């Protein structure tokens, strides 16, 4: 529930298996890796999330969907040199930035960071060839922050 309920610091991860071998291996890992164990705060947080978090999760998903829709529309309507792919199952928008005309991925990353003043995920993380010319934009943030980032990208792209 770490991402769904924004409780990453509570160590609330859980795993389930019917496979005896996987169970044995996971238990062995927990014995040697202190970071894998939960504490009382994590246990309470986990139970609270699963027992009382439905409304929060529903509201969060609705908010993120609206933010995603606004962000994708803004990019595709206002930044003609960038195309946004509407994600179906993640909070990252895949940006096709090849229309900006940069020759290297480094130039694209520098443009986003130095000119647009935004820090995006590098598309080449998903393959040097396949991700070249692409960036990922995280929209799992307050909507005004997301829109400010997109405005900065637009203004920087308009200056090219």
For each of these PLM feature ranges, what is it?
Residues 5, 85-88, 127-131:
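A short beta-turn/loop motif at secondary-structure boundaries
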Residues 47, 63-72, 84-97:
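Conserved glycine-rich beta-strand-loop-beta hairpin in the small C-terminal domain of fold type I
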Residues 1-2, 81-82, 123-127:
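Short, solvent-exposed loop/turn elements at beta->coil junctions and helix N-caps
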Residues 1-65, 155-157:
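Conserved core segment of the aminotransferase class I/II
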Residues 18, 51, 96-98, 140-142:
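Residue-level recognition of strand-loop junctions within catalytic nucleotide-signaling folds
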Residues 10-11, 60, 89-91, 133-135:
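Short amphipathic alpha-helical segments
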Residues 103, 111-120, 126-160:
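PLP-dependent enzyme catalytic core of the Aspartate aminotransferase-like
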